[in-house]
Amino acid sequence: MTTFNGKINGNGLKIGIAVARFNAFVTQQLLTGAQESLVQHGVNETDIDVAWVPGAFEIPLTVQKMITTKRYDGVIALGAVIRGATAHFDYVCSGVTTGIATVSLATDTPIMFGVLTTDTIEQAMDRAGFKSGNKGADCAVSLLETLDVQRAILKADLA
């Protein structure tokens, strides 16, 4: 039996980040957390590209375009969708979630889902590091680990 475990090492990796401008007071915090975590784990600052989009619904297509360039080893999707009084929240959350999963599987590229889907502004702020923890930073670490475990699987397959 073979066990594959990924290490958190960003040396030599090129990372794309798509981030929604809507609810920027939250998404900027997520972005900062992701960038700082990537650099802390060995990704060169110049190897991190950020694409700002109007809202979360625009993230999947932008991520797909980023991946199509073949410049990125993996991508992080960041946004904050906060429930309002209408069904709009449900449609946006469903669309962005399905879109990101579809792009990841279709392109065989890891995309970390850092789109917060919360009932309140306070919940979004908590998850963006205003109190503790930052889902952007968590996504960065998860992406590096996922990329490493995928490399290990491919390496074993080639052996």
Swiss-Prot record:
Gene Ontology, cellular component aspect: cytosol; riboflavin synthase complex
Domain of life: Bacteria
Sequence positions that bind (2S)-2-hydroxy-3-oxobutyl phosphate: 85-86, 127
GO BP term (any one): riboflavin biosynthetic process
Pathways per UniProt: Cofactor biosynthesis; riboflavin biosynthesis; riboflavin from 2-hydroxy-3-oxobutyl phosphate and 5-amino-6-(D-ribitylamino)uracil: step 1/2
Catalytic residues as annotated in Swiss-Prot or TrEMBL: 88 (proton donor)
Gene3D superfamilies documented for this protein: Lumazine/riboflavin synthase
One Pfam family this sequence matches: DMRL_synthase
This protein's record includes keyword Transferase: yes
Known catalytic reactions: (2S)-2-hydroxy-3-oxobutyl phosphate + 5-amino-6-(D-ribitylamino)uracil = 6,7-dimethyl-8-(1-D-ribityl)lumazine + phosphate + 2 H2O + H(+)
Keyword Magnesium belongs to the record: no
UniProt-annotated binding residues for 5-amino-6-(D-ribitylamino)uracil: 22, 56-58, 80-82, 113
GO molecular function: 6,7-dimethyl-8-ribityllumazine synthase activity
Keywords: Riboflavin biosynthesis, Transferase
InterPro entries according to UniProt: LS (IPR034964), LS/RS (IPR002180), LS/RS_sf (IPR036467)
EC number(s) per entry: 2.5.1.78
NCBIfam families: lumazine-synth
Family per record: Belongs to the DMRL synthase family.
Biological role stated in the UniProt entry: Catalyzes the formation of 6,7-dimethyl-8-ribityllumazine by condensation of 5-amino-6-(D-ribitylamino)uracil with 3,4-dihydroxy-2-butanone 4-phosphate. This is the penultimate step in the biosynthesis of riboflavin.
Name of this chain's protein: 6,7-dimethyl-8-ribityllumazine synthase
Organism: Lactiplantibacillus plantarum (strain ATCC BAA-793 / NCIMB 8826 / WCFS1) (Lactobacillus plantarum)
